[in-house]
Amino acid sequence: RRTATFSKRKKIFLVSTPTIKGLSNIEREFELSDKRYYLVPCPYCGGFQRLEWSQIRAEDNNALYECIHCGKLIGEHYKTQMLANGHWQPTAPSDGLTAGFHLSSLYSPVGWLSWKECVDIYEKTKKNPSLTHGFRNTILGETYEAESDAPEWQRLYEKRETYPIGTIPMGGLFLTAGVDI
């Protein structure tokens, strides 16, 4: 109710780092928005694109960005120019009231967190997978989804057995049940 005074002129900002997929409050709010991403132009071909982790290339103790349009490798020294000439692009229908913005650390200005530093942090996750969660959340600005080795529900269903209600199977000491939804 703090913004009620401002009626239609109010602006509410929800700013956060995403956490666990399906549980993250900021992910839920972003999904309800028009999902804007910042597109930057390639300094070689001018094609606009999101800065995506999949396009980072580590070479000779350096990190470069491969353009999705022309395939040329872009040095980080072009980033200032790219950021200055970029624009926000909505990717979902808008309700006219809610704008959502996603920006990863790959957009950090020159002199801040570099692409090479992002690669170095990523390399540490290969040696210590427990760091993957933090890398996805804080560097990529994405939710983390843990890999699971749980069997498919059909495999569990095939193992079921039928017993009359009120009976415990022979050899059973106690009966317990659990459900994870």
Summary of predicted features, one role per range:
Residues 1-181:
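Short, flexible loop motifs at catalytic/binding sites
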